[in-house]
């Protein structure tokens, strides 16, 4: 989730609390365990955001920006100096705890330190973090020249798997369809693949929302589950044309 810092920048002197938050952020770039600890700490840490310098609205309204992927996100920062670096003449800096920030804008997408190799928090991840402190682990792999995906002739998933994912996708109008196939087991443990038909601009959110919903359940059940996406405008990939592939959400795609 948290990307490597693309380059070092010089900032104004930070407070000890900001320095500690930055230290935790650097550790989070290297380890998922530290990433979980960082986000839990972030909830009670002081963070900074941008608001319009002139606004008569009774509640503080935060400024959003359009991410290169096409969605809008609320930027927030681990230090005042980083918030200043990204500000402009029409912007004022507001401070609050991470918890107050996330709770105060339900349904919003957030981006931490957007100018400094930060990360995106999608609405589903915000809900999970606020409710139980969970942070899903998502590793993006390119299939490339790896072995082709071969489906077993019949999938036997846990009873909870497809209903849980269907509930996620019902709140995501950009998800067109979803398919399930069972792959060759790994060390005796069942292995499944869920393929989501979704436009490229929403693919990452769909995968991360899915992972957030089922990662703990998969670990408790001792099964492996991978996620894949494909552009519905380009039709189903060849691996979804095999016997044993089950469409469990949305209409059949050509």
Spans of features found by a protein language model:
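An interfacial alpha-helical scaffold signature
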Residues: 2-254
């Amino acid at each position: 989730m948290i990307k490597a810092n693309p380059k070092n920048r010089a900032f104004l002197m930070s407070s000890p609390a900001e320095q500690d938050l930055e230290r935790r952020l650097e550790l989070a770039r290297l380890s998922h365990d530290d990433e979980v600890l960082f986000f839990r700490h972030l909830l009670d840490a002081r963070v900074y955001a941008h608001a319009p310098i002139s606004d008569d609205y009774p509640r503080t309204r935060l400024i959003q920006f359009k991410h290169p992927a096409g969605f809008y996100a609320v930027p927030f920062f681990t230090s005042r100096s980083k918030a200043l670096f990204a500000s402009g003449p029409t912007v004022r800096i507001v401070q609050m705890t991470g918890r107050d920030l996330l709770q105060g804008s339900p349904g919003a997408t957030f981006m931490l330190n957007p100018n400094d190799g930060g990360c995106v928090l999608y609405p589903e991840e915000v809900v999970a973090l606020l409710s139980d402190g969970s942070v899903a682990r998502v590793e993006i792999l390119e299939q490339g020249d790896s072995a082709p995906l071969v489906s077993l002739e019949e999938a036997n998933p846990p009873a909870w798997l497809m209903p849980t994912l269907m509930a996620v996708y019902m709140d995501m109008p950009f998800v067109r369809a979803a398919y399930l196939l069972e792959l060759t087991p790994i060390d005796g443990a069942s292995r499944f693949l869920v393929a989501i038909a979704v436009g490229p601009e929403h693919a990452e959110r769909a995968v991360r929302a899915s992972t957030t919903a089922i990662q703990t359940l998969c670990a408790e059940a001792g099964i492996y589950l991978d996620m894949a996406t494909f552009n519905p405008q380009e039709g189903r990939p060849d691996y979804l044309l095999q016997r044993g592939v089950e469409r469990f959400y949305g209409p059949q795609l050509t």
